[in-house]
Every structure is written in structure tokens, then in C-alpha cells.
């Protein structure tokens, strides 16, 4: 599985340029159908806007963009260039423009749409898709907080807790961190605790 960058989160950004209002959204998607559904969602939300321009880039190589009535090459392509330059995939970006009555010109539009896409990406952040181990660990209650901190310290995250005689934790850990985590767990538990890997998943990691 090859690592690649995706948006860390969905995000929104907004700015005004010569009385035109630009509202940009970035979403993490996994398919063209999902990307187009997000585009349709934003077009319905901002149905009264002059333009809802968009682009998306998928890990499978699919690349699409639309200018939605803006002069050709002044909206979707500059937006797309932002994500290709940043090497971000599995992303869809929609930029809504409410026209303010002042023409921006081709150069002004190109800069504005590129800025809108970059602002939304900066708000979303980036994460690297990477292999994660899904682990199970039975933890005595007095050790719970220490184990929680240990997981977080190794860039892991807890998926669920099952409270019984002890706490059974289901958590995710980057594969490259599992050996260090296991060694630290053995040390703090005096060799009494070990985590069991149940599967591996390919998921976004920490924000970069």
C-alpha cells in the first residue's frame, strides 16, 4: 500500500475580493460518485450564487474540474493546480462566488479561485494515508490513564472501550509504531500486558 496525502478534515473558508464573496469547501472523498454528490450538495446549498466552481483529484488518477460559467481556465483549473502542487488526493473542492458587481478580469479570477482553494486546504490540513494496526488490549482499571497516554504518545487513537472486569480497548496504531509501543507496554506493565493485532487498515494519519 503506497502512502499518499489527503485532507485531514473537511473544511470551509471565505474571503471577499472587490465585493465578490468567495466561499470554499474541501471534502475528503473516496470515489467520483462521492465527489459529485458533494458538488451537488454545495450547488443546492448555494443555489442563489452566480457560480459554484469545482475540482476533484482521486488516488486512482481521476481528475475533473468545472468552471460553472466563469471564463474557461479561470476557476476549476487554478483550483485543481493547488491540489496537484500540494500532492493532495481523494479531495473535492467547491468554490462558490457571489458576484459583487465589479469585474475581476481573467487574472483576478484565476488568483481568487486559487486563493480560495488554498485557504480551504490550509483550513483542512493534510494527513498521510498509511497502514494502521487495529489492536485489542485488556487493561486493568488502575492502568487505564497510563495506557491511554501511551497510545496517544505513539500517534494512536482509541476506537472503543468495553468495560467489564477490566477495560478492553480497541485502538488504532500506525504499523511503524507498533514495535515501539509493544516494548513500552511491556516495560510499564512489567511484562503482564500485550496487545493483539486483529487486522490492518489503510487510514489517514496525524495532521501534518
Where are these regions (language model features)?
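C-terminal regulatory domains involved in ligand/effector binding and gene-expression control
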Residues: 1-73, 199-208
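Positively charged, aromatic-enriched nucleic acid-contacting surfaces
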Residues: 61, 71-88, 163-165
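Active-site beta-strand/loop microenvironment that shapes enzyme catalytic pockets
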Residues: 79-123
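Short glycine-/aliphatic-rich beta-strand segments at the starts of folded cytosolic domains
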Residues: 125-141, 171
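Short amphipathic alpha-helix segments
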Residues: 138-156
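Short amphipathic alpha-helices in soluble, non-transmembrane regions
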Residues: 147-152, 180-189
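Conserved short beta-strand edge segments in small beta-sheet-based binding/regulatory domains
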Residues: 158-162, 189-206
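Terminal, non-globular segments
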Residues: 171-180
Amino acid at each position: 500500500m503506497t502512502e499518499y496525502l489527503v485532507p485531514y478534515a473537511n473544511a470551509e473558508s471565505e474571503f471577499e475580493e472587490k465585493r465578490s464573496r468567495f466561499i470554499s469547501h474541501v471534502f475528503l472523498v473516496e470515489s467520483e460518485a462521492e465527489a459529485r454528490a458533494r458538488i451537488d450538495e454545495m450547488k443546492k446549498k448555494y443555489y442563489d450564487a452566480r457560480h459554484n466552481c469545482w475540482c476533484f483529484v482521486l488516488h486512482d488518477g481521476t481528475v475533473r474540474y468545472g468552471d460553472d460559467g466563469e471564463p474557461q481556465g479561470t476557476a476549476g483549473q487554478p483550483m485543481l493546480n493547488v491540489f496537484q502542487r500540494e500532492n493532495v488526493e481523494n479531495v473535492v473542492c467547491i468554490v462558490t462566488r457571489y458576484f459583487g458587481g465589479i469585474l475581476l478580469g481573467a487574472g483576478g479570477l484565476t488568483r481568487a479561485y486559487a486563493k480560495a482553494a488554498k485557504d480551504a486546504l490550509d483550513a483542512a490540513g493534510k494527513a498521510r494515508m498509511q497502514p494502521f494496526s487495529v489492536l485489542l488490549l485488556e487493561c486493568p482499571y488502575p492502568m487505564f490513564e497510563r495506557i491511554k497516554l501511551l497510545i496517544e504518545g505513539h500517534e494512536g487513537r482509541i476506537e472503543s472501550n468495553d468495560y467489564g472486569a477490566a477495560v478492553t480497548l480497541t485502538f488504532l496504531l500506525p504499523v511503524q509504531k507498533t514495535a515501539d509501543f509493544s516494548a513500552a507496554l511491556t516495560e510499564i506493565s512489567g511484562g503482564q500486558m500485550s496487545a493483539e493485532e486483529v487486522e490492518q487498515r489503510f487510514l489517514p494519519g496525524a495532521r501534518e
